[in-house]
């Protein structure tokens, strides 16, 4: 089997970044006064509402939906939709409050919609947010199957926004485990599985391959306790582009010298598709779904609040390294 990477699977992150820059370069209007933006181009945006900021972000489930369709199992992708949005709000120090969903569908199906709703309800329960409403669009000439996305809002005190600017040399990187593949890298995972001639119904441990890939994205509500108890310098929700998400923070050198052990699904994909190690870490979370950057003397306090451990450190310089591999070379 030929070697796979994300671009060969159909998702070129660099091409996507160029397209996003092209879009952003045209949009110039900015509101002033009440509601003016005080943070943009981060995990979430923040608008000024006096003593506090309203935070907002939007995200979707991506091609995980195609696995759900193959398995005819739709009751957990709603959790993924909530998680992808809520975790991005948490990643700037914001408390999530509410969200709306958007479903674009080829043909309305009552059973599928009810199953999606089960996951949305469970995700909202875990995150303690309200689903205020949403939009369902029937688009038979545009959509094959359906797409699921959401937009979430939260709040944060303006002096408590976490951007990563406080990160300094000597800080440590604490990783909180993921529940599995989450909602990123599924295009590569699917291409590898399908090219190998495997079925999503084939056994994978005590589950099937499809069931393992559909494991819901973890919602990291413990971050709110971490923010109350610890001196946090930076937060990273590890999603698309994997550990390169650390580059969204302050321009420093991030060294992951003792990564958490990835779940078996990652090594399965890597071996099956002959995917290079660096490509794995810049595509998947590799068992590390959320990262907290903080002073070394705060790490023991953090360990009492959430699962995980210190996996690396911050130095002057630039780049993201896993052991001796530079991911952004």
Swiss-Prot record:
**Protein's pathway:** Purine metabolism; IMP biosynthesis via de novo pathway; 5-amino-1-(5-phospho-D-ribosyl)imidazole from N(2)-formyl-N(1)-(5-phospho-D-ribosyl)glycinamide: step 2/2
Q: Does the keyword Isomerase apply?
A: no
Q: Which UniProt keywords apply?
A: ATP-binding, Cytoplasm, Ligase, Nucleotide-binding, Purine biosynthesis
Q: Which positions, given as ranges, span the membrane?
A: none
Which superkingdom does the taxonomy of this entry point to?
Archaea
**Which compartments is it annotated to reside in?**
Cytoplasm
Alphabetically, the GO molecular function entries are: ATP binding; phosphoribosylamine-glycine ligase activity; phosphoribosylformylglycinamidine cyclo-ligase activity
Catalysed reaction equations from the record: 2-formamido-N(1)-(5-O-phospho-beta-D-ribosyl)acetamidine + ATP = 5-amino-1-(5-phospho-beta-D-ribosyl)imidazole + ADP + phosphate + H(+)
Primary site of residence: cytoplasm
What are the EC numbers? Answer: 6.3.3.1
Record's GO cellular component, any one? cytosol
Entries under Gene3D superfamilies matching the protein: PurM-like C-terminal domain (3.90.650.10), PurM-like, N-terminal domain (3.30.1330.10)
Q: Which GO terms describe its biological process?
A: 'de novo' IMP biosynthetic process; adenine biosynthetic process
PANTHER family given in the database record: TRIFUNCTIONAL PURINE BIOSYNTHETIC PROTEIN ADENOSINE-3, TRIFUNCTIONAL PURINE BIOSYNTHETIC PROTEIN ADENOSINE-3-RELATED
What NCBIfam families does UniProt report for this protein, alphabetically?
A: purM (TIGR00878)
HAMAP family for this protein: AIRS
Similarity comment text for this entry: Belongs to the AIR synthase family.
What is the name of this protein? Phosphoribosylformylglycinamidine cyclo-ligase
Give the organism the record lists: Archaeoglobus fulgidus (strain ATCC 49558 / DSM 4304 / JCM 9628 / NBRC 100126 / VC-16)
Gene symbol? purM
């Amino acid at each position: 089997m030929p070697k796979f990477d994300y671009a060969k699977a159909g998702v070129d992150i660099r091409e996507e970044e160029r397209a996003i820059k092209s879009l952003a370069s045209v949009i110039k209007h900015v509101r002033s006064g009440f509601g003016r933006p005080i943070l943009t181009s981060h995990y979430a945006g923040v608008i000024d509402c006096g003593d506090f900021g309203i935070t907002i972000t939007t995200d979707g489930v991506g091609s995980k939906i195609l696995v759900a369709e193959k398995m005819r199992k739709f009751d957990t992708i709603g959790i993924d939709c909530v998680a992808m949005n809520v975790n991005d709000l948490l990643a700037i120090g914001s408390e999530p409050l509410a969200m709306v969903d958007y479903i674009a569908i080829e043909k309305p199906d009552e059973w599928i919609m009810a199953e999606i709703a089960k996951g949305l309800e469970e995700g909202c329960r875990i995150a303690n947010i309200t689903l205020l409403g949403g939009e369902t669009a029937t688009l038979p000439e545009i959509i094959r199957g359906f797409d699921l996305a959401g937009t979430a809002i939260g709040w944060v005190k303006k002096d408590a926004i976490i951007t990563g600017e406080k990160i300094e040399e000597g800080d440590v990187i604490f990783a909180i485990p993921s529940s599995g593949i989450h909602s990123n890298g599924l295009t590569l995972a699917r291409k590898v599985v399908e090219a190998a001639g495997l079925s999503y119904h084939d056994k994978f441990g005590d589950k099937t391959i499809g069931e393992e890939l559909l494991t819901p994205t973890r919602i990291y509500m413990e971050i709110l306790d971490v923010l109350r108890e610890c001196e946090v310098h930076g937060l990273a929700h590890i999603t698309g582009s994997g550990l390169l998400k650390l580059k969204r923070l302050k321009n420093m050198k991030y060294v992951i010298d003792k990564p958490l052990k990835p779940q078996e699904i990652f090594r399965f994909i890597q071996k099956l598709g002959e995917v290079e190690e660096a490509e794995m870490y810049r595509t998947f979370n590799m068992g590390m779904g959320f990262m907290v950057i903080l002073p070394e003397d705060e790490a023991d306090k953090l360990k009492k609040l959430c699962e995980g451990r210190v996996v690396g450190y911050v130095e002057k310089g630039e780049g993201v390294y896993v052991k001796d591999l530079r991911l952004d070379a």
